[in-house]
Amino acid sequence: MTRLEIVDSKLRQAKKTEEYFNAIRTNIQFSGKENKILAITSVREGEGKSTTSTSLALSLAQAGFKTLLIDADTRNSVMSGTFKATGTIKGLTNYLSGNADLGDIICETNVPRLMVVPSGKVPPNPTALLQNAYFNKMIEAIKNIFDYIIIDTPPIGLVVDAAIIASACDGFVLVTQAGRIKRNYVEKAKEQMEQSGSKFLGIILNKVNESVATYGDYGNYGKRDRKRK
């Protein structure tokens, strides 16, 4: 099995936000034992969903849960800057196109209990690949092997891929950058994801300006459909 090493700078970054993601992990655990397969998305690129996916997966693994992180943002993966391969690797697109077995794409890491499925090469038809039978077949094959499966998806505000992926998940989390995305776009993204039939677990407000906000501003994670003034 191919091994991936998480780069030191990313580990240090994750350490700085460890308490924050431990709190998010706890909220997810309290949301229900049935919520094991989670899609992570955002409205636009650059809001921090991939970092959130990785940090959440790390938190789960470090808490003792056997965790699989799937990089399903096959159009614009940034995880190659987080995990470095010790050899030639195959990824999700190789499997979905029928050019690799499932066992070929699940990689061990230098973090105990954390395994990763890389995205693979950028395909000419990302949406069509996700809609074929291989994706659901993969989820069925692995869902009882891992305690949690975290799937980093493309931004729902740009392409429909995230909703397709979410249809095979127990729930989804929406990551949004503070001060960047208007509320109506966030609401629309939430509605698009809910059309998949997946359960909305909450919004993570990311990249908050600490000069005008405190740790307490993250406390609404997991609260759904709150009444707004």
UniProtKB/Swiss-Prot annotation:
Q: What is the effect of changing V173I?
A: In strain: CNTC 1/82
Q: Name one GO cellular component term.
A: plasma membrane
Its Enzyme Commission number(s) read: 2.7.10.2
- Keywords in alphabetical order: ATP-binding, Capsule biogenesis/degradation, Exopolysaccharide synthesis, Kinase, Nucleotide-binding, Phosphoprotein, Transferase, Tyrosine-protein kinase
Q: Which CDD domains match?
A: BY-kinase
Q: What class of enzyme is it?
A: transferase
Pathway named in the protein's UniProt entry:
Capsule biogenesis; capsule polysaccharide biosynthesis
- Sample GO molecular function, one term: non-membrane spanning protein tyrosine kinase activity
Q: Which reaction does it catalyse?
A: L-tyrosyl-[protein] + ATP = O-phospho-L-tyrosyl-[protein] + ADP + H(+)
What is its biological role? Involved in the regulation of capsular polysaccharide biosynthesis. Autophosphorylation of CpsD attenuates its activity and reduces the level of encapsulation. May be part of a complex that directs the coordinated polymerization and export to the cell surface of the capsular polysaccharide.
- What family is this protein classified in? Belongs to the CpsD/CapB family.
Q: What is this protein called?
A: Tyrosine-protein kinase CpsD
Q: Which species is the source of this protein?
A: Streptococcus agalactiae
This chain is encoded by the gene named cpsD
